[in-house]
Amino acid sequence: MRKQSKIIFYAGIVLGFAAVLTGVALSGGRKIPKDFTVSYEGIKTADITAGVSVHDPSVIEVDGTYYIFGSHMSGASSEDLRNWTSIGDGYTSSNPIFDDLLGTEHVFDYTGSRDSVIPTDDGTYHVWAPDVVYNRAQDLYYMYFCTSSTWNASNLCYAVSDKPEGPYTWKGALIYSGFTKDTIEATDVLDYVDIDYAKKNYIMAGNKYNYEKYPNAIDPTVFYDADGKMWMVYGSWSGGIFLLEIDEKTGLVIHPKEDEKNGVDPYFGKRLLGGGHKSIEGPYILYDEESGYYYLFVSYGSLTSCLLYTSPSPRDRG
């Protein structure tokens, strides 16, 4: 029996996963649906052998070599996407992916370790969900990742290397979440909004972080748009998925002007979707040059669930 399905792009390694993806093509100014139907007839499943284990994977290809990075300071490389060689793994100072991340000052000041302002809930290190992107302006590789302590207290960070495999040197923190009136001074939030705005919007009654409206600062991915601008999409559960522009010359986020009507916060950026602490996480935005559309992928619900949104602009949900 001949089986057909629609292809979906997944930001990582695709292992026998199929779903529905609807695209568009432009012809004479009209948008014509693109059919991604393919046949899997004759395709066999490869043997699975013991290899590397990478959670929350992000893959980048450089000169024919694929590099995969994941949570817990793990990474590997491959030339065929089947046979992988470990680069590093685990929370050790000698992990070659980083330039002694555990021994670098200020990395875990706010979250991510038992000694942080907000300690990890299990007393161990939490370094999660890295995404590596080549910065065209600087000819450097940037790794965006997060340290996290609880289900909403997290910190987006970045590190830099001149080689895709590393070592990556930590450069600084970008976005903080999960703060209260007692911990906001340990963040950079008040560099961008005043204390009255922060108390009104970010902190709920009972001195709790307003997690239903604002994000958990984890799961970052970075991409270039059609005009060459860099963007970072991030978020998990909590207030949903958010978008911030990246300054290509520095690798830092650009905090926008407040635009409440269009869901733009001066610190966290543009909320794309989600909120109310509903299931949604792991955002990834793919720009398709042929259609001129951006595809936003997120995971939600159970292990097998996935959502797809399309838009002609990276700042809007289609």
What is each PLM-predicted segment?
Residues 67-68, 78, 86:
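Eukaryote-specific detector of the first structured module of a protein
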Residues 309-316:
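Conserved small/polar residues in nucleotide/adenosyl-binding loops
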Residues 75-77, 158-160, 243-245:
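Conserved blade-register residue in beta-propeller folds
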Residues 29-61, 85-133, 167-224, 249-286, ...:
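Surface loop/turn signatures of beta-propeller and other carbohydrate-active proteins
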Residues 55-73, 127-151, 170-171, 219-243, ...:
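Hydrophobic core segments of beta-strands in well-ordered, beta-rich domains
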Residues 1-29:
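Gram-positive cell-envelope targeting signals
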Residues 79-82, 163-164, 247-249:
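Short loop/turn segments that connect beta-strands within beta-propeller blades
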Residues 120-123, 148-151, 210-212, 301-305:
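Short consensus segments that form the blades of beta-propeller domains
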